[in-house]
Amino acid sequence: MNAKTLFVVFLIGMLVTEQVEAGIWSSIKNLASKAWNSDIGQSLRNKAAGAINKFVADKIGVTPSQAASMTLDEIVDAMYYD
């Protein structure tokens, strides 16, 4: 097999591989989007947000509702400058 034939086979293989990978990434993106927007995904995000608010409230000494309304800058200032 000469170099030109090998090069053509390599290019065709690359084109086929690129199309297959594009399909795989598209299906992964669709599955992740469905999982993120599902009821279970939303409830897990809400639980995580509640746990973060409770952790921050315990660290800086405020109520969880106050911690939820604070911006990130306020939280960092309260943790490191008080």
Curated annotation (Swiss-Prot):
GO terms classed as biological process: defense response to bacterium; hemolysis in another organism
Subcellular location: Secreted; Target cell membrane
Secretion signal span: 1-22
Keyword annotations of the record: Antibiotic, Antimicrobial, Cytolysis, Hemolysis, Membrane, Secreted, Signal, Target cell membrane, Target membrane
Propeptide position ranges: 70-82
Highest taxon of the lineage: Eukaryota
Pfam family, one: Antimicrobial_7
Note: Adopts the characteristic alpha-helical amphipathic structure in TFE solution, but an unexpected random coil conformation in water. Is an unstable peptide when the venom is stored after milking. This produces a shorter peptide, named Vm36, which lacks the 8 amino acid residues at the N-terminus.
Family: Belongs to the non-disulfide-bridged peptide (NDBP) superfamily. Long chain multifunctional peptide (group 2) family.
Protein name from the UniProt record: Vejovine
